[in-house]
From Swiss-Prot:
GO biological process, one term: viral process
InterPro entries: Gemini_AL3
Subunit structure and binding partners: Homooligomer. Interacts with the replication-associated protein (REP). Interacts with host proliferating cell nuclear antigen (PCNA). Interacts with host retinoblastoma-related protein 1 (RBR1), and may thereby deregulate the host cell cycle. Oligomerization and interaction with PCNA are necessary for optimal replication enhancement.
Cysteine-cysteine disulfides: none
Taxonomic source organism: African cassava mosaic virus (isolate Nigerian) (ACMV)
Keyword ATP-binding: no
UniProt name for this protein: Replication enhancer protein
Record-stated family: Belongs to the geminiviridae replication enhancer protein family.
Keywords: Host-virus interaction
Main function: Increases viral DNA accumulation. Enhances infectivity and symptom expression.
Length: 134
């Protein structure tokens, strides 16, 4: 849902993409929170934020696009190592596709979490997306 207008995101908006070779460093990855074994659980909770860079947003007609992934895993990774592997694998997946869109980034992250990185229990996605009104 578009946060500014409250309208649902249409399929053409979600599938609108840009070739990967046209934009340098299209995505920013940050770990906003890493909870190590909270409440005596045997799993870590890692929150990763993926931001679209300015040039990519301009091409897609987006004002703001943050994708927040909350990941439950039984691994005990170092924060920087997890981020480096996650970032590399997502960009590798997108390079193989050749196009970057909102749906492709979500699909790439799910592929990495459930097929590449082992012992992922669950992933929860929240987003902050605002399309250009004008």
């Amino acid at each position: 849902m578009d946060l500014r207008t409250g309208e649902l995101i249409t399929a053409p908006q979600a599938m609108n993409g840009v070739y990967t070779w046209e934009i340098n460093n299209p995505l920013y990855f940050t770990i906003t929170r890493h909870q190590q074994r909270p409440f005596l659980l045997n799993q870590d909770i890692i929150t990763v934020q993926v931001r679209f860079n300015h040039n990519l947003r301009k091409e897609l007609g987006i004002h703001k696009c943050f994708l927040n992934f909350r990941i439950w895993t039984t691994l005990r990774p170092q924060t920087g190592l997890f981020l480096r592997v996650f970032r590399y694998q997502v960009l590798k997946y997108l390079d193989n596709i050749g196009v970057i869109s909102i749906n492709d980034v979500i699909r790439a992250a799910c592929h990495v979490l459930f097929n590449v990185i082992e012992k992922t229990i669950e992933c929860q996605l929240t987003h902050e997306i605002k399309f250009n009104v004008y």
